[in-house]
Amino acid sequence: MQISTKFTIAIHLLAAIAYFSEGYRVTSEFLAGSIGTNPVIVRGVMLKLRGAGLIETKRGPGSIRLLRPLSAITFLDVYRAVETGSGKALFHFHEHPNPQCPVGRNIHRSLDGMLLDIQQRFEADLASHTVADVLNRIHACARKEASPAATSAKASEDIQAPKKG
């Protein structure tokens, strides 16, 4: 199973919208620069977030805003917005198992409950994390980068002799 980059792009977008809400014109181009992707991809993800009621967008520069506090936006909200939609199955079953085969005839009865249990645990874990958690970590990392010890360590890294190749 693999979740597409739309999920992490959406988390990045939401965190960046909040982080840069004061003093910046937050546009799809601005966000694309932060993410390192094409503005068209950003606009596609924003469309999904808007459809899920997480952001509001208006024509014109810097007219993107959060509709809920980041502490009220869970990873599950984001996942459902950009990946599956609400209430959709995580696992997709092959369409026509052979009813003449004992495995084919009984696969749904044997596997469906297990897959549902896995999905419920996955969704509960996603629901336990918020975008505010991510932004808090971003702020902590930024403070650490700005500390005198980090600046001093970075300066000493910059002046080290190059390694022999």
Give names to the regions the model predicted.
Residues 1-13:
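Short alpha-helical segments that sit at the start of domains
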Residues 11-22:
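Short amphipathic alpha-helical interface segments
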Residues 25-36:
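A short alpha-helical element within helix-turn-helix/winged-helix DNA-binding domains
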Residues 38-41:
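Short coil turns linking two alpha-helices in DNA-binding domains
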Residues 45-50:
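Basic amphipathic alpha-helical segments that dock to polyanions
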Residues 53-67:
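Beta-hairpin "wing" of winged helix-turn-helix
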Residues 70-96, 115:
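Conserved segment of winged-helix/HTH DNA-binding domains
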Residues 92-165:
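C-terminal regulatory/oligomerization modules of transcriptional regulators
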